[in-house]
Regions:
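Active-site Tyr-X1-5-Lys
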Residues: 152-181
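N-terminal Rossmann NAD(P)H-binding glycine-rich loop of SDR-like oxidoreductase domains
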Residues: 9-31, 36
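NAD(P)H-binding glycine-rich loop region in Rossmannoid oxidoreductase-like domains
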Residues: 40-41, 50-107
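A conserved pocket-lining segment of Rossmann-fold NAD(P)-dependent short-chain dehydrogenase/reductase
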Residues: 94, 149-154, 195-196, 202-224
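Glycine/proline-rich active-site loop of Rossmann-fold NAD(P)-dependent oxidoreductases
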Residues: 177-179, 191-204, 236-247
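Conserved Rossmann-fold NAD(P)-dependent oxidoreductase catalytic core, especially the SDR/UDP-sugar
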Residues: 85, 89, 95-157
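Mid/C-terminal beta-alpha module of Rossmann-like enzyme folds, strongest
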Residues: 223, 230-279
């Protein structure tokens, strides 16, 4: 069942790498957007990037809002039929205190989903990650039925994604509202950035090229193009078939040495030597 177009969608954290592509695709389809930014200095670069794609930025209303504060969230969501909750902190390094990452992720999700339920929005699409699915396990294959083991000593990022996503499902399942939830769980996200924002996976690839990662690390992950991730968000909004679903997005998994080989085949300098995996 397809849903009609031309309505207003709320996007949290529009300046982010994935969120910008979501905004592009929604504007191309004629949607209007209410968007949050944590820092208003990002508004002009966002507008410029979207104008450069010949998009009508007058269809975006911006609101300053922080994941850890109630201020402006309700105003930002008013009049929106659907919600894309994309904003979530991600680390460039493991934080000293895991709660620096977990608290804004969980509280931000609780804030957005609770408000969406209060305002009776039709649908929420939440950006999660395969990190919410696979961390802490010894097995090799995963499905949407799996959850990262948050009671095990796993890194802060997968714990933050799993706990935030669980909070969203708990709120939806305990509610008597008709609001539907779909969760998108992408693997390592790569592809062009519309602003200076990048993903942690992109940093690995750029590190292989610029010498900051001089040897192939024993990292084995799946990859997915950011434009496909954004498309999945839009399609989830427009189809009732995705209601109540978690959706993993991943292409073939690759070791870092395989990524380096692809880079070298395309004219880039990338490491030829690999670190061994400890037994």
């Amino acid at each position: 069942c397809k849903i009609h177009y031309m309505k207003k969608v709320f996007i949290s954290g529009i300046s982010g790498y994935i969120a910008m592509h979501c905004a592009q695709q929604l504007l191309e389809k004629g949607y209007s957007i209410n968007a949050t930014v944590r820092d208003t200095k990002k508004i002009d670069p966002i507008k410029k990037a979207l104008k450069d794609l010949s998009l009508d930025v007058s269809k975006i209303d911006f609101f300053e809002a922080d994941l850890l504060s109630d201020q402006n969230w309700e105003d930002a969501m008013t009049g929106c039929e659907d919600v894309l909750h994309v904003a979530s902190p991600y680390p460039l390094a493991q934080p000293k205190d895991e709660n620096d990452l977990i608290k804004p992720a969980v509280e931000g999700t609780e804030r957005v989903v609770s408000l969406a339920l209060k305002q009776n929005v039709r649908k929420i699409v939440l950006t999660s990650s395969v990190a919410a699915i696979s961390s802490g396990h010894t097995k090799k294959q995963f499905s949407e039925e799996d959850w990262s083991k948050v009671d095990e000593p796993i890194p802060a990022y997968p714990k933050s994604k799993a706990l935030a996503e669980k909070k969203a499902w708990d709120l939806i399942n305990k509610s008597n509202k008709k609001t539907k939830l779909t969760v998108i769980n992408p693997a390592g996200v790569i592809g062009p950035s519309l602003t200076s924002e990048v993903s942690s996976t992109q940093l690995i690839i750029s590190g292989l090229v610029n010498g900051k990662i001089p040897i192939n690390l024993p990292i084995h992950i799946g990859y997915v193009d950011v434009r496909d991730v954004a498309l999945a968000h839009v399609k989830a909004l427009e189809s009732t078939k995705s209601d109540g679903e978690r959706i993993i997005l991943s292409n073939t998994e690759l070791w870092t040495k395989d990524v380096s080989k692809i880079l070298r085949e395309n004219g880039y300098n990338a490491p030829r030597f690999s670190a061994s995996v400890a037994n």
